[in-house]
């Protein structure tokens, strides 16, 4: 292609101006929601979203696996968000002449000193640094890309105190963010292109985001309000996973069917609840076995490293808070399962991956990784985040799904889990599949028998 200012890798009709999610807070399940938020923001600013790379249940420009390693490559496009891959974006930055201009934008939680919200323009520091977080590497500086940050000072945008307590407050803040990033006044003050304040301001080609908000600030209605010419995007839906992971999950589910899948999130669960919850879970399994006699297998997905208690927890954040009570509770659970769960066999993905037929692409990837490491490499060693993805995909396909009761407020003492977006994604997928089943006249093997069942400290009958 002609490598002048008109060279652009976007799809027809998509603008050659970009929003890059350089760093996203939170792990994979919630990071999907945050990426969708930035996709809506990109649309509102008439920009194209760059799909971040992925690894270890995180989404960031700093990782080596492409977005399509976890998800369907067109996951955001299916929702009406215009995207390109990070590889396409980097290639564009290398070929474009002149070098693309860029600006760092940081969005974090409310700040006590800015009760009404605020915009900070850091006109003195290195323009490639994240305001107030100088050690955070966005992985967009040379030689990673040819982006030129020198012409624009970093921006930090803070929401008003309590903005998240109402939908109006959240979306109102979202509209103000769109106005801020479109504002000639803000843009002029953040420009370093000339010492003269009268110099014309040009929007940067690229906005590089450090995004740490926990609550949604954008909705399709905001996009339609600020840019009515753009077709309205669809509401958020969890991204479909790459076919290699859904094929693998289908193979595992077929080998276990009919089976119960359990998601037991113990992170932040009160340690005194662990032992009684484990006992209650065993009673619940016995009840389900009597209700569904054909079930012989139980698939356990948990953040506790049940295969190797001395190993790494399945959740990166949980690894910091695992206690001796966790170890005691799970040792007791495993020992009691063998005695009390008559007719049931307990398994995990770590045990199943050696028993099922692996998709060709995965088998080749594991063979390559094993050759490079000089020893056999499993899925968790290939990428620790894949364990959670496959656990979710398997649980979505189980005939029966079981999770702990999330005790809140006065019922906290009964809790055997905490509210989890991981669990919510499984339940939503199961409800959608059950809805599809109800439209069929004939029942077939592999259909779901419930959307979710729960157990609590007080007993197994709490659905």
Give the role of each language-model region.
Residues 1-297, 301-304:
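Secretory-pathway glycan-assembly enzymes, especially type II membrane glycosyltransferases
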Residues 23-26, 380-381, 410-414:
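Active-site rim elements
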Residues 57-71, 426, 449-461:
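Short, mixed-charge aromatic SLiMs
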Residues 60-65, 271-275, 308-319, 406, ...:
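A short acidic (Asp/Glu
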Residues 121, 128-133, 138-143, 155, ...:
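Surface-exposed intrinsically disordered loops and tails
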Residues 276-387, 429, 433-439:
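Catalytic lobes of large eukaryotic enzymes
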Residues 386-447:
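A donor-sugar binding/catalytic signature common to diverse glycosyltransferases
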